[in-house]
Amino acid sequence: GFGEDIAMKQHQVNSLLDILFVF
């Protein structure tokens, strides 16, 4: 659903931020 899509996007963004902040 729409809420699920948002949650997925947020998870992807958080993962990318985690990767960036590691470097």
From Swiss-Prot:
Subcellular location per the Swiss-Prot or TrEMBL entry: Secreted, Extracellular space
Keyword field: Copper, Oxygen transport, Secreted, Transport
Highest taxon, organism lineage: Eukaryota
Summary of the function given for this chain in its UniProt record: Hemocyanins are copper-containing oxygen carriers occurring freely dissolved in the hemolymph of many mollusks and arthropods.
GO cellular component: extracellular region
Designated name of the protein: Hemocyanin subunit 4
UniProt tissue specificity: Hemolymph.
Native organism: Carcinus maenas (Common shore crab)
Family note: Belongs to the tyrosinase family. Hemocyanin subfamily.
A GO term for molecular function: oxygen carrier activity
